[in-house]
A protein has these predicted regions:
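ATP-dependent carboxylate-amine ligase catalytic core
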Residues: 7, 21-23, 27, 31-35, ...
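A conserved segment at the C-terminal end of the G1
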Residues: 49, 57-74
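Charged, amphipathic alpha-helical linker segments immediately N-terminal to NTP-binding catalytic cores
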Residues: 1-21
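Extended acidic/charged loop-beta regions that coordinate divalent cations
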Residues: 122-171, 202-243
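Nucleotide phosphate-binding/pyrophosphate-handling subdomain across enzymes
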Residues: 133-142, 149-160, 164-168, 175-178, ...
Length: 424
């Protein structure tokens, strides 16, 4: 098969068709291909970020702070919202198609008959691509779990675990302790581990101790607390005072900030920001798809919350901005998510539900969501075929409502961002 003239989309479509297991946790395949490529990780600071929720926010905070200090920073996150290129950035700019294509060609030249999943291809390509840039630091987001995730072929300078909650039980275990054990698999011997997961700090700390690793736990070794003139971040040896926390943040974002700052101290304390530069950063800090607000006739509030823990945090942020009046929600979930728990967090502030089937085989159907909503006594529900139909429908009735909430998955928030941007 001649792939010399393939565009990026051709490569991605082909990768999806090769291995039908979208999730197939194992390090054997990526390690074998990594060895065949002769890949050697760069001698720079590498931050590896795992957790149930808050990984993306923590990565963005770390990236913003390190770039502010003048470092050249590469990041790898997943999934993307609009374009695949978002997954890999260098100094805040997504890489060009050619960067990925060159890396995919390099992988194919050595892969042989070793099967790779879509995510494994992307991870190897991300590392190859970033290695071509003069990076001072990499910030890498774990995809799923940790121990067997493709990103775990790296040996990080600091391992970060943001929080632990129930999600992806089919692959990671049915209890928070089982999930914590999987995520703690990223802890590297003799490299510090920073943990923002207070509920499983003991078990993660035990694993860190067995690996002869310095362990920093939120609440014990570092914290973000209220002070006289703002918030105060403190560790055993450093303090940053007068921090102005954004008024729409919830506890999750505050914990992510505390964890990011401790991670920087654990890696290189000289890179910690002062309060003035940190406040300037926070005043301008935003992440696509995380409490992202568009003003299109009425406010559209978008959040990729896709499990109960994330939904609780999203609800807290809505309360922080004192959301009131009649609100409408565009909503869909994957089949493995706890729909009833998710819905219970929003039903008292939602006057109308608009549901649809997302463009992925893992999506619940709109009809199934509607059926389960009616079983909970929620009957003002409109079912539409796909996200775009839902957005167009909302456009015709939004004058009756105070705000539009869009949530449940990257697969509905991403298309909504694209749709709203096209309306500008």
């Amino acid at each position: 098969m001649n792939r010399s003239n393939w565009a990026l989309d051709d490569w991605l479509n082909w990768q999806e068709s090769l291995n039908q297991n979208q999730i197939d946790l194992s390090l054997d395949r990526v390690k074998e291909v990594k060895k065949k490529m002769g890949f050697i990780q760069p001698d720079i600071d590498i931050y590896l970020v795992a957790g149930t929720n808050g990984k993306g926010t923590t990565v963005h905070l770390l990236n913003s702070i390190l770039c502010l200090k003048g470092l050249n920073v590469g990041t790898y996150t997943s999934p993307h919202l609009k374009k695949y290129n978002e997954r890999v950035t260098y100094n805040n700019k997504p890489l060009e198609d050619t960067n990925f294509i060159d890396s995919f060609i390099e992988i194919e030249n050595v892969r042989g008959d070793v099967p790779l999943t879509y995510f494994e291809y992307g991870t190897l390509a991300a590392f190859l691509s970033l290695n071509r840039f003069p990076c001072d630091a990499w910030i890498i987001e774990v995809g799923l779990g940790g121990r067997l995730d493709a990103t775990n072929i790296l040996n990080p300078n600091v391992s970060i675990i943001t929080n632990i909650a129930l999600d992806h039980q089919e692959w990671l275990g049915n209890t928070v302790n089982e999930i914590a054990t999987e995520k703690a698999g990223i802890i590297s011997s003799n490299a510090p581990c920073v943990c923002g997961a207070l509920n499983t700090g003991e078990i993660i700390g035990e694993i860190a101790n067995k690996k002869n690793t310095d362990f920093y736990l939120i609440g014990d070794d570092f914290s973000l607390s209220n002070g006289v003139n703002g918030s105060v971040w403190s560790s055993k040896s450093k303090t940053i005072e007068k921090i102005k926390i954004p008024n729409h943040w919830a506890q999750g974002e505050e914990n992510n900030l505390a964890t990011a700052l401790m991670s920087i101290e654990a890696c290189n304390a000289d890179l910690l920001p002062n309060s003035e530069s940190l406040n300037h950063l926070l005043d301008n800090f935003s992440i696509p798809g995380r409490f992202q607000v568009f003003d299109y006739r009425i406010p559209w509030i978008l959040d990729v919350a896709h499990n109960p823990n994330a939904a609780i945090n999203f609800r807290e942020r809505l309360e922080a901005i004192k959301l009131h009046g009649k609100n409408i929600i565009i909503f869909s979930l994957m089949k493995d998510k706890n729909l009833e728990k998710f819905v219970s967090l929003f039903e008292d502030i939602i006057a109308k539900w608009v549901v649809c089937t997302m463009d992925t085989p893992r999506s619940l159907s709109g009809d199934e969501i509607s059926k389960r909503l009616s079983e909970k006594g929620l009957f003002d529900v409109t079912v539409l075929n796909d996200p775009d139909e839902a957005f167009e429908y909302i456009e015709t009735i939004n004058h009756n409502y105070n705000a539009v909430i869009v949530t449940g998955s990257f697969e509905i928030v991403g298309p909504c961002i694209q749709w709203l941007e096209n309306k500008k």
